[in-house]
A protein has these predicted regions:
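Conserved phosphate/anionic-ligand binding catalytic regions in large, soluble enzymes, centered on
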Residues: 24-39, 154-161
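Alpha-helix capping and helix-loop boundary segments enriched in small/acidic/polar residues
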Residues: 61-69, 73-74, 91-99, 120-123, ...
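Short glycine-rich or small-residue beta-strand-to-loop segments that form or flank ligand, phosphate
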Residues: 23-30, 84-91, 122, 214-221
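Glycine-rich oxoanion-binding loops at beta->alpha junctions
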Residues: 1-12, 39-84, 93, 99-100, ...
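Glycine-rich phosphate/diphosphate-binding loops that line cofactor/substrate pockets in enzymes
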Residues: 9-22, 74-83, 203-213
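Conserved strand-to-helix beginnings and helix N-cap segments that scaffold or border functional pockets
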Residues: 36-37, 72, 97-101, 133, ...
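Active-site phosphate/pyrophosphate-binding segments
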Residues: 111-262
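FAD-binding core of FAD-dependent oxidoreductases
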Residues: 31-35, 66, 91-93, 163
Length: 262
């Protein structure tokens, strides 16, 4: 459970980055970025880039693919803007974010020099070990820890998700309080008929035992598309072992009614 002191540290770091940069690239893959991406998309104006005044940095994502076009175009688009980065990886050796970070790091160092670049890069990684922890120590990056007992896909309420969200202007204190309220509503001692999490788990298990192997999550707002992607990460990675588990898929309605719903 994140403490008020940890929230303050995340907010302070976010303010520091925001004072230095107009664009902040968040580098990660899978659970290391999908939680933050889902919350950011769900809580943001989809047309905010058209507003004349930007009072918060623009948050972009990298390291979630190996497309050379994507990285080239990202760096080209950010040339006119002051740049910073948040790199998220437990080990620092996951291929996609490792490649993206090397390229973004080189861009920042070329622009500002190594000393100034170190102020513009924050690493979220293991407390003691791993390639990214070693590099962060050598370069003097500010760092936050990925807790040992929390997998990446569950980490949105740790600095993994909270730092990118705070940079984007999301009130992370309110977000955490909302999660705490929901945790109380779904605690193990809450009766079945009042507990939506237990009801959902029971329904999934009953249908799985009847032979249903595919579950489709439908959303009705484009801003929830990445909530669906995060949901697929949560269930696909958690249950998809040894040929077991329900296959998670998603549709965005009403658009997908004209394809998947035919």
């Amino acid at each position: 459970q994140i403490t008020p002191a940890q929230l303050d540290a995340v907010n302070d770091c976010a303010k520091s980055l925001a004072s230095l940069a107009e664009v902040i690239v968040v580098i990660g893959i899978g659970g290391s970025y999908l939680g933050a991406k889902a919350v950011l998309e769900a809580m943001s104006d989809p047309f905010q880039l058209l507003h004349k005044k930007q009072d918060k940095p623009i948050v972009l994502f990298a390291g979630q693919n190996l497309s050379e076009d994507y990285l080239y175009e990202l760096l080209a688009a950010t040339k006119p803007y002051k740049l910073a980065a948040i790199v998220i990886s437990k080990s620092g050796t996951t291929t996609e974010p490792a490649v993206a970070f090397r390229i973004v790091k080189e861009e920042i160092e070329t622009r500002y020099g190594k000393a100034e670049a170190a102020k513009r890069i924050v690493a979220v990684t293991d407390a003691k070990r791993g390639a990214l922890r070693t590099l962060a120590t050598q370069e003097g990056y500010a760092t936050f820890v990925i807790p040992d007992d929390i997998g990446g896909r569950y980490s949105v309420l740790t600095p993994v998700g909270l730092l990118p969200l705070a940079v984007a202007g999301i009130n992370i204190g309110e977000l955490v309080r909302g999660a705490q309220d929901m945790a109380k509503m779904t605690a193990a001692d809450v009766p079945f008929d009042e507990n939506p999490a237990v009801q959902y788990a029971a329904a999934r298990n009953a249908l799985y035992k009847k032979g249903y192997k595919i579950e489709i999550l439908a959303s009705y707002d484009p801003r929830l598309q990445y909530v669906s992607e995060w949901w697929k990460q949560l269930y696909g990675e958690s249950e998809g072992k040894e040929g077991k588990g329900i296959f998670p898929a998603s549709v965005t309605l009403t658009a997908d009614l004209h394809s998947m719903g035919q």
